[in-house]
């Protein structure tokens, strides 16, 4: 076997071995869950258009309140420690602010946070009141949304072809329909990596709002691209063979039901606030050139 090929195989084995605990949990045999893909109508899909500064002004108090959620508090503490280990002593210019980078780290770390967060995001939009009173991840949702927006603006490649493998859930989708994942959705630029995570459903996706987070991820070898809840896709192919689903998706822009909901509740009771709530937008224009990986934030 040629040496470069051997190194590539050993690298993939090393990558997969880093997730032994998570993969073991995900590989437990059980009944396959059947899910029909749609527009995820109960998703909380806020893009915070027109209220970024107002939302950031609320973060300190909001974050303190949400630390009562132990899953969030523990995930955030671990991610903060990892950020300090990687970039705490470096003073190079940054792409993301410290809190946005920590949010991405927290999402990619082992543990329950990403799973609990995603499940909550899928249903937090069942009503505005449910989001306001029962969704304990408002801070994380906002910071992740802003992180992806910032990275998307700074990359040179507007769209990416990625893969997503799912174990334990068999998704079905009608060809020609428009669907959303409705949560922050992990995918990989490497097909082999995606296959490792499952083959009960396998997605091939063109995303124009998902962005590579390799330089921010706890597991950079996964070549992860993180897709936001509000991106919508056309189903271009959907097949079912030997108990497995294959679904091909092409980006169709973005669509949101909600906009600036937390700020509206906090600041707009006396008089209506005017935000630019672009409910549906086309694909992005060419992004800004000169994307650079996260180096290190300045000290705050």
UniProtKB/Swiss-Prot annotation:
Catalytic reactions on record: L-arginyl-[protein] + NAD(+) = N(omega)-(ADP-D-ribosyl)-L-arginyl-[protein] + nicotinamide + H(+)
SUPFAM superfamilies linked to this entry: ADP-ribosylation
Disulfide pairings: 51-260, 159-208
PROSITE patterns membership: ART, TR_MART
InterPro entries linked to this entry: ADP-ribosyltransferase_ARG, ART
Keyword Transmembrane helix listed: no
Keyword Secreted: no
Enzyme Commission code(s) on record: 2.4.2.31
Coiled-coil ranges per UniProt: none
Signal sequence extent: 1-22
UniProt: NAD(+) binding residues: 107, 164, 183, 217
Alphabetized GO MF terms: NAD+ poly-ADP-ribosyltransferase activity; NAD+-protein-arginine ADP-ribosyltransferase activity; nucleotidyltransferase activity
Active-site residues, record numbering mapped to chain: 164, 186, 224
Domain of life: Eukaryota
Region Disordered, residue ranges: 276-300
Record's protein name: Erythroblast NAD(P)(+)--arginine ADP-ribosyltransferase
Underlying gene: MADPRT
């Amino acid at each position: 076997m040629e040496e470069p090929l051997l190194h590539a195989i050993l690298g993939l084995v090393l990558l997969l071995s880093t997730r032994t605990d998570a993969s073991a949990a995900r590989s437990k045999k059980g009944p396959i869950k059947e899910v029909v893909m749609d527009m995820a109508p109960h998703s909380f899909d806020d893009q915070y258009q027109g209220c970024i500064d107002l939302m950031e002004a609320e973060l300190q108090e909001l974050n303190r309140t949400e630390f009562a959620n132990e899953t969030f508090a523990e995930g955030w503490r671990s991610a903060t420690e990892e950020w300090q280990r990687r970039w705490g002593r470096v003073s190079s210019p940054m792409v993301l602010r410290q809190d946005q980078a920590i949010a991405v780290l927290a999402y990619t770390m082992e543990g329950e946070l990403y799973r609990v967060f995603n499940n909550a995001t899928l249903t937090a939009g069942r009503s505005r009141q449910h989001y306001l009173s029962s969704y304990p991840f408002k801070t994380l949702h906002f910071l992740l949304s802003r992180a992806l927006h910032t990275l998307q603006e700074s990359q040179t490649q507007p769209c990416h072809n990625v893969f997503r493998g799912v174990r334990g859930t068999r998704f079905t989708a009608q060809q020609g329909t428009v669907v959303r994942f409705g949560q922050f959705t992990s995918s990989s630029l490497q097909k082999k990596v995606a296959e490792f995570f499952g083959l009960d459903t396998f997605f091939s996706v063109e995303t124009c709002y998902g962005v590579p987070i390799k330089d921010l991820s706890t597991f950079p070898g996964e070549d992860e691209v993180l897709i936001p809840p509000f991106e919508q896709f056309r189903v271009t192919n959907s097949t079912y063979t030997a108990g497995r689903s294959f679904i091909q998706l092409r980006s169709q822009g973005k669509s949101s039901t909600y906009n600036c909901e937390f700020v509206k509740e906090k600041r707009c009771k006396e008089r209506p606030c005017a935000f630019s709530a672009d409910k549906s937008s086309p694909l992005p224009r060419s992004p800004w050139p000169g994307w650079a990986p996260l180096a290190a934030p300045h000290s705050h």
